[in-house]
């Protein structure tokens, strides 16, 4: 009996993204501006992989604004391949960035096809599928590349009752690599991972007295900026 297990891995702020067990992506984000972008994936295992690439929106639905090609292919062991991102004719906002997710899923072929025994006397098996997702950010021609020292002035933090409110007055998706409340690093920062253009986020800070916020952003190359500070 065979079952399929999908493990989903999201973005981490490093120069490349590795799923540890299956494949490596050479970027943590894709910026789509003038040219057709691409990512390189590497199969460092001793057996081939079946790889599938798709574009998803922020609500975890398949998206048709972009196409990842090739959509499905086989990677031999110790090999590399390129996935290109192509924009369709669907119109996107031209006054701000738009974001999707490029998700790449891999699964080893059956043992019969690879001639590699990965079981020890078992009659059932589980095909483990690993999915790695990185941000795909569309930057229209009318929106210049971000200058992060200038962006800081347009990110506003303030308290409103039991909430800490972050307002993004820029046309950019702002991603954070780390956030500090006073001197305490926020470890469970899922609500502050990123903020959309011209929007705000509310973070519940019930029973906390916070006087200042420190934060570092992630730039277009996937690198961490310096720490910035706001007094509340």
UniProtKB/Swiss-Prot annotation:
N-terminal signal peptide: 1-20
GO biological process, one term: chaperone-mediated protein folding
Major place of residence: periplasm
Disulfide-linked positions: none
Chaperone keyword on record: yes
Coiled-coil positions: none
GO CC annotations, alphabetized: outer membrane-bounded periplasmic space
Protein keywords: Chaperone, Fimbrium biogenesis, Immunoglobulin domain, Periplasm, Signal
Subcellular location: Periplasm
Transmembrane segments: none
Top-level taxon of origin: Bacteria
PANTHER family xrefs: CHAPERONE PROTEIN CAF1M, PILUS ASSEMBLY CHAPERONE
Task of the protein: Involved in the biogenesis of the CS6 fimbria.
The family this protein is said to belong to: Belongs to the periplasmic pilus chaperone family.
Name of the protein: Chaperone protein CssC
């Amino acid at each position: 009996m065979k079952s399929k297990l999908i493990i989903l891995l999201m973005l981490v702020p490093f120069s490349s993204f590795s799923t540890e067990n299956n494949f490596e992506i050479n970027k943590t984000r894709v910026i789509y501006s003038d040219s057709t972008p691409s990512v390189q994936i590497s199969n460092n295992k001793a057996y081939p992989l079946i790889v599938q690439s798709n574009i998803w929106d922020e609500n975890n639905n398949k998206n048709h604004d972009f196409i990842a090609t090739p959509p499905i292919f086989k990677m031999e062991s110790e090999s590399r391949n390129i996935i290109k991102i192509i924009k369709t004719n669907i119109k996107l906002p031209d006054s701000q960035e738009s974001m999707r997710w490029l998700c790449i899923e891999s699964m080893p072929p059956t043992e019969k096809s690879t001639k590699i025994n990965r079981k020890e006397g078992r009659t059932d098996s589980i095909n483990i599928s690993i999915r790695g997702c990185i941000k795909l950010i569309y930057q229209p021609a009318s929106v210049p590349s971000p200058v992060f020292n200038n962006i800081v002035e347009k990110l506003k933090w303030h308290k409103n009752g039991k909430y800490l409110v972050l307002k993004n007055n820029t046309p950019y998706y702002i991603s954070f690599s780390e956030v500090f409340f006073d001197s305490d690093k926020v470890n469970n920062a899922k609500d502050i991972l990123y903020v959309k253009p011209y929007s705000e986020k509310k973070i519940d800070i019930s029973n906390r007295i916070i006087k200042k916020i420190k934060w570092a952003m992630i730039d277009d190359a996937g690198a961490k900026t310096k720490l910035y500070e706001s007094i509340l």
